Amino acid sequence: MQHPKKVVLAYSGGVDTSVCIPYLKNEYGISEVITFVADLGQGDDIESISQKALNSGATKSVIGNLVEDFVEKYAFPAIRANALYGEKYPLSTALARPLIAENLVKLARKLNAGAVAHGCTGKGNDQVRFDLAINALGPDLEIITPAREWKMSREEAILYGEKFGIPAPVSKKSPYSIDVNLLGRSVEAGFLEDPMQEPNEEVFAMTSSIDDSPNYPKDIEITFKNGFPIAIGNESLSPLKIIQKVNYLAGKNGFGRIDMIEDRVVGIKSREIYEAPGLLLLIKAHKELESITLNPDVLDFKNLVEKKWAQLVYQGFWFGPLKKALDGFIDATQTSVNGKVKIRLHKGNAIIIGRSSENNSLYREDLATYSKDDIFDHKQAEGFIYMWGMSNKIWAELNSKMNN
């Protein structure tokens, strides 16, 4: 098969994507390999990673500062959607993939490349997310996936790279597979593959252990406007600053760890450890504010939408038509999600201790109270109950006659 002479490769600096560079040139006959390094707030030395790509044989290396887009266009919509895959995982890794894919396609267009490539294996979720996003945004582009096609073990891949001047990792190989960005960390493999093995503290980096977290609780107040978090306490902050601050506060107090059995897109179950302190806290606060500002029927239906939205994003359909339609529903619900939520952080817990909405609260104290200020008309309850239970009463009468 004849491949384009120029390809844009999603590059992380790891063994697989480094080996992809000479592999694409020598096994696929590609002349120019341009690497794209995404800065998602992972804390790495991005310039060094970019230089490593050049040292590994890349024709050119491009750095994309995607942190603000990551927060505003991906994390914040997930907060409004209360997105938790499997009712636990806030999609911290999954949200990054369509953003990287989008920028891969943009760079390929800009440089007139006929193909894009990534280093995902055939066993994980990311291959699905990348391929579906690229097909949606650049259906004419070829997608090349060397790590899915070569039959090399990790050790063999390292030896292959050494032939082309790519040094082997100098440190002892970590037993874990780790992915990090601003929103969180995912950790798998090693002894964690035994679902009964408790993770030790070396697995975690964004959150304190219960023993090491402060002995005294920390209360914080989060303000939302149209479903978006806009302030912590009395301080209005940019979206990026909000994520950074709640990451610190929640993580310091031991909140934000997830240990779960996850159903992967490819059909297998895997044991995953996640840290996502800020994202989890903001989703928790946002959902609480919705409880006071949205009607019961809207809340019930939104619960269904949220589950499907999270599934679609996890499964790679960020740019799909159903996800777009669900976005429209979520947008329509958020115009009244304005107010404040108070949370107490302590020893791994995030406890809601208050919520308010000055202009959009559906909570009426004069209707809910049992004091003398109660204005609820109790006499209306009898007629309501009669109508509400009519169908059950008819059914019971009919069955009583049949049984006799």
Swiss-Prot record:
Biochemical pathway: Amino-acid biosynthesis; L-arginine biosynthesis; L-arginine from L-ornithine and carbamoyl phosphate: step 2/3
Enzyme class: ligase
Broad class of the protein's primary localization: cytoplasm
Compartments where found: Cytoplasm
Keywords noted in UniProt: Amino-acid biosynthesis, Arginine biosynthesis, ATP-binding, Cytoplasm, Ligase, Nucleotide-binding
Single annotated GO MF: ATP binding
Binding-site list for ATP: 10-18, 38, 119
SUBUNIT field: Homotetramer.
Protein family per UniProt: Belongs to the argininosuccinate synthase family. Type 1 subfamily.
Classification via PANTHER family: ARGININOSUCCINATE SYNTHASE
Protein name: Argininosuccinate synthase
Organism: Prochlorococcus marinus (strain MIT 9515)
Organism lineage string: Bacteria, Bacillati, Cyanobacteriota, Cyanophyceae, Synechococcales
Gene name tied to this protein: argG
